[in-house]
């Protein structure tokens, strides 16, 4: 097989926003997929929170890789309700994350009718449900207009104050 990621070492400060920059094919998405357990490294190890990464660490990692996995026929609230039921979380948490991503006013509007920016914010809300210590976002501003990009950047900048490393 082809080597995609080689000799990478990252040390990311807690409660900060950290970005991976590089040309297409440099291994940025592959690295993020390894941290989220989607891909398994063929060698080396990943340290998380002072220990070698293990599957249970996924309880502390939220991720939005590429397009958000949304039920287009459900409202923002209903999309989150499906997940809180599986995770055993309260409805109060739904209200909290909708407030964080500023989607409290969507009412009965279905996710399929959302703008791309609203869909990205709902995807981030899904990733925030479990109160992650680490939030991984892979190209979250793709396809957004300049105003949507600025709103999303502002949202991302607010996370370290909430104890979330991005």
Enumerate the language-model features and the residues they cover.
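ABC transporter nucleotide-binding domains
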Residues: 2-166
